[in-house]
UniProtKB/Swiss-Prot annotation:
NCBIfam families: rplD_bact
Quaternary data: Part of the 50S ribosomal subunit.
Gene Ontology BP annotations: translation
SUPFAM superfamilies tied to this protein: Ribosomal protein L4
Name of the protein this chain belongs to: Large ribosomal subunit protein uL4
Regions crossing the membrane: none
Keyword Cell wall biogenesis/degradation carried by entry: no
GO MF annotation list: rRNA binding; structural constituent of ribosome
Length: 206
């Protein structure tokens, strides 16, 4: 069972903290994580790009000049692809880029991403991250205490004070545990997570 330190906001270790083997101690599966990240990014695409073919652009019904005798190249329509304002060859049309990934694969990818943070010693568990008012200095102090640069902060619930305190800090993102995903876990080097958020993750994935 993985054991990490439980810290306060000043960076002082309070005690050891046990993590679930079933969530934070699985064998890291790079392939499944890659598949899930590809799907996440693909599913963000709108797929609304559209261009017109020569059949759809306006104008061009009449032959611009006679076939022979002008000295110019023969043309049949001013909306042929080689003309300015002509149609597009193989014009792109709206489509869905959605990729489906089995639930079991998504769960394994999440466990693998969390386990990789434990393996790399890039996870920090905080006893609490409560703030009465937004204070960027307070978040900066926490980051400095753990020498954290590119950091993902995960809270148990949506916390506007923490979010507002960190949103102007470059390379730092704050999300509630409900919105935690594999892409964000891999994108950021360090994971700072509250004890309550860990409990929620273990409830879902253990």
């Amino acid at each position: 069972m993985p054991i990490v330190g439980l810290f306060n906001k000043e960076g002082q270790k309070i005690t050891d903290f046990e993590l679930s083997d079933k969530v934070f101690g699985v064998e890291v599966n790079q392939y499944v994580m890659h598949q899930v990240v590809v799907a996440l990014l693909a599913n963000k695409r709108q797929g609304t790009q559209s261009a017109k073919t020569r059949a759809e652009v306006s104008g061009g019904g009449i032959k611009p000049w006679r076939q022979k005798g002008t000295g110019r190249a023969r043309q049949g329509s001013i909306r042929s692809p080689q003309w300015i304002h002509g149609g597009v060859v193989f014009a792109v049309k709206p489509r869905s880029y959605r990729i489906s990934v089995p639930k079991s694969a998504r769960r394994l990818a999440m466990k693998s991403a969390l386990s990789s943070k434990v393996e790399e010693n890039q996870i920090v568990v905080l006893e609490s991250l409560e703030m009465d008012t937004p204070k960027t200095k307070e978040v900066v102090k926490i980051l400095d205490a753990f020498e954290a640069k590119k950091t993902l902060i995960v809270t148990a619930e949506s916390n506007q004070n923490v979010y507002k305190s960190a949103r102007n800090i470059q390379g730092v993102s704050v999300i509630p545990v409900n919105n935690l995903n594999v892409y964000d876990l891999l994108k950021f080097d360090k994971l700072i997570i509250t004890k309550d958020a860990v409990s929620k993750i273990e409830e879902v994935y253990a």
